[in-house]
């Protein structure tokens, strides 16, 4: 599908058509809303091929895959989440809404079914025990349903995601305490690529969960490598581990804003963390890839000769650099110096938080032994 944008009284109208090359899509919240409206229209009017829904600041025209009656008072509709130019695991996923008319005038109840996750930990926008359908999608569903709901009726709306349990392990839900499915998300109705605010917001929620569970000493990792090795080496709870992806600066800034975090241990593979020593707080390779330059500079600071520096500079991977450092018996000295600089820069930039930096190899070897001794987590 693609998105056609036109002006509507200063806002936007977005029409959705098939074309996976588009940069933006629509959120699971918008898909669930469209399916709910279509199911209601099946009951009170006629089955639509498309529906128009109102999202915050936008109007969306969404194609309906199928509608059917379950009984005289209940209908269901299926909407497929459009493809767009992003590695979103929910692209192409079907969302089903089952709408049942009730005699409880004007009262709309929203619940979940198979494939919609349940919240098990505090700190999220939804209370523990509830289905993980976020406030904005709930509001969107209610407001759009009210446009078509007969005056004397209420409605029970059940959202189902057939592939939700299968997709859930590919999302961050388990880290946030959402089990048995995925979440219905969205704040604007439009899904942006993962480099956008929508993605960084999803990372930030981890901080809220950690604080809600009483953790003030947190371990920030770039991704799966850091998480895996931290769990192998340290005694800590899942909620103490915060994934920051490439957005180091954003996540540290958000942590600093809370005013509640005592310490942050930056823990991860050398290829990511060393960039921070050069003041690079977005570690995405296409944004800044100065690994060779950083490693060459720090090797020079500890006295590496010209040939060694030349060899380091011509390496392709950080792991290759480490082999050269090992051959020259300067690995620990180089990485301890880099870790010191990381701590110095972060401490200056985010005052009031105690920082530590632990740099590791792919195989889990600790490259900064003195730093890991000082972190506020027990070692295994």
Curated annotation (Swiss-Prot):
The UniProt catalytic activity note for this protein reads: Co-precorrin-5B + S-adenosyl-L-methionine = Co-precorrin-6A + S-adenosyl-L-homocysteine
Classify the source by domain of life: Archaea
Enzyme Commission number(s): 2.1.1.195
- The reply on keyword S-adenosyl-L-methionine is yes
Pfam families on file: CbiD
Q: In which pathway does it act?
A: Cofactor biosynthesis; adenosylcobalamin biosynthesis; cob(II)yrinate a,c-diamide from sirohydrochlorin (anaerobic route): step 6/10
Keywords associated with the record: Cobalamin biosynthesis, Methyltransferase, S-adenosyl-L-methionine, Transferase
Q: Which PANTHER family match?
A: COBALT-PRECORRIN-5B C(1)-METHYLTRANSFERASE
UniProt similarity note: Belongs to the CbiD family.
Write down what this protein is called: Cobalt-precorrin-5B C(1)-methyltransferase
In its UniProt entry, the species of origin is given as: Methanosphaera stadtmanae (strain ATCC 43021 / DSM 3091 / JCM 11832 / MCB-3)
């Amino acid at each position: 599908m693609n998105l056609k944008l036109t002006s509507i009284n200063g806002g936007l109208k977005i029409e959705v058509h098939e074309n996976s090359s588009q940069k933006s899509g629509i959120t699971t919240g918008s898909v669930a809303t469209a399916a709910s409206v279509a199911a209601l229209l099946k009951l009170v009017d006629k089955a639509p091929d498309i529906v128009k829904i109102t999202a915050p600041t936008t109007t969306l025209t969404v194609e309906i895959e199928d509608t059917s009656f379950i009984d005289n008072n209940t209908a269901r509709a299926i909407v497929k989440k459009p493809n767009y130019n992003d590695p979103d695991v929910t692209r192409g996923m079907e969302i089903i809404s089952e709408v049942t008319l009730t005699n409880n005038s004007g009262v709309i109840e929203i619940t979940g079914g198979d494939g919609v996750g349940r919240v098990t930990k505090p700190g999220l926008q939804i209370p523990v025990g509830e289905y993980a359908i976020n406030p904005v999608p709930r509001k969107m569903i209610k407001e759009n349903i009210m446009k078509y709901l007969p005056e004397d009726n209420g409605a029970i709306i059940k959202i189902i995601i057939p592939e939700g349990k299968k997709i859930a392990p590919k999302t961050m839900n388990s880290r946030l305490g959402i089990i048995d499915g995925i979440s219905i998300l969205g704040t604007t109705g439009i899904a942006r690529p993962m480099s956008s605010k929508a993605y960084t917001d999803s990372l930030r929620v981890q901080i809220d969960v950690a604080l809600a569970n009483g953790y003030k000493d947190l371990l920030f990792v770039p991704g799966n490598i850091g998480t895996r090795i931290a769990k192998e080496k340290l005694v800590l709870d899942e909620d103490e581990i915060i994934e920051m992806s490439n957005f180091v600066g954003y996540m540290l800034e958000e942590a600093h804003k809370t005013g509640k975090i005592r310490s942050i241990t930056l823990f991860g593979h050398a290829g990511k963390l060393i960039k921070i020593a050069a003041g690079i707080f977005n570690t995405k390779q296409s944004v800044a890839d100065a690994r060779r330059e950083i490693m060459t500079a720090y090797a020079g600071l500890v006295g590496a000769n010209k040939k060694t520096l030349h060899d380091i500079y011509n390496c392709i991977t950080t792991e290759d650099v480490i082999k050269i450092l090992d051959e020259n018996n300067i690995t620990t000295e180089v990485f301890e110096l880099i870790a010191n600089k990381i701590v110095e820069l972060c401490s200056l930039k985010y005052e009031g938080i105690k920082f530590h930096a632990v740099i590791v190899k792919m195989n889990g070897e600790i490259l900064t032994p003195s730093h890991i001794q000082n972190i506020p987590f027990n070692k295994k």
